[in-house]
Amino acid sequence: MEKKKVFIPFLYLISIVFLPWWIYLSFQKSLESWVTTWWNTKQSETFLNDIQEKKLLEKFIELEELRLLDEMIKEYPETQLQKLGIGIHNETIQLIKMHNEDCIHMILHFSTNLICFLILGGYSILGNKELILLNSWVQEFLYNLSDTIKAFSILLVTDLCIGFHSPQGWELLIESIYKDFGFADNDQIISSLVSTFPVILDTILKYWIFRSLNRVSPSLVVIYHSMND
């Protein structure tokens, strides 16, 4: 009976770790054909965000320049002009295909991640007892650590998350999440998140040290500040 009580929360922890990957892969495969069919047959309006519109505009400007060049080079033989016109036509078709693939990719990733979060949320609510037991195990483990190890762990985590070199890590993380949801790169949004998110975390950490740790373990706060200095 005791082994069963230990095994169930441990199995729940493993399922939480691997369940998102399984949900993501399974739903992505099942939704891919449906999203592709819907976009190619039912979509009547062109869906563009600012980044996609800018890229398409740049491509069409290039094609327009080629067309003007086609009109200017009148001394070329007719066969050469025909080849140039065919090349512009093929490039336009390829551009439209790339646009459709980008839109399908964005819708597919966004819908898959949304379904994944909803399922994980329901799974966490149903497994509330297991989460409470896992939380008690973590608290017991942290309680048995010495104040020096606790202070070192807090200092290590804070330096990794909000230290001097953390903006590069946050930029990579936010870009990966941004792309995982299917959105196009937006340097302004990514830069604003990189510049503000670590500051918010630093403020929350200082407030937590001041309110919680200073009340629960003043010696830990003293050791932390000594190591930080």
Swiss-Prot record:
Is Ion transport one of the keywords? Answer: yes
InterPro entries to which the protein is assigned, alphabetical:
CemA (IPR004282)
Domain of life of the native organism: Eukaryota
Q: Name one GO cellular component term.
A: chloroplast inner membrane
Ordered alphabetically, the record's keywords are: Antiport, Chloroplast, Hydrogen ion transport, Ion transport, Membrane, Plastid, Plastid inner membrane, Potassium, Potassium transport, Transmembrane, Transmembrane helix, Transport
From the UniProt record, list the reaction(s) this protein catalyses. K(+)(in) + H(+)(out) = K(+)(out) + H(+)(in)
Keyword Calcium listed? The answer is: no
How would you describe this protein's topology in the membrane?
Multi-pass membrane protein
| GO terms of molecular function | antiporter activity; proton transmembrane transporter activity
Q: Name one Pfam family in it.
A: CemA
Where does the UniProt annotation locate this protein? Plastid, Chloroplast inner membrane
- One of the GO biological process terms: potassium ion transport
Q: Membrane-spanning residues where?
A: 7-27, 106-126, 154-174, 189-209
Q: Which family does it belong to?
A: Belongs to the CemA family.
Described by its record, this protein's role is as follows: Contributes to K(+)/H(+) antiport activity by supporting proton efflux to control proton extrusion and homeostasis in chloroplasts in a light-dependent manner to modulate photosynthesis. Prevents excessive induction of non-photochemical quenching (NPQ) under continuous-light conditions. Indirectly promotes efficient inorganic carbon uptake into chloroplasts.
- From the Swiss-Prot or TrEMBL record, give the protein name: Potassium/proton antiporter CemA
Source organism of this protein record: Spinacia oleracea (Spinach)
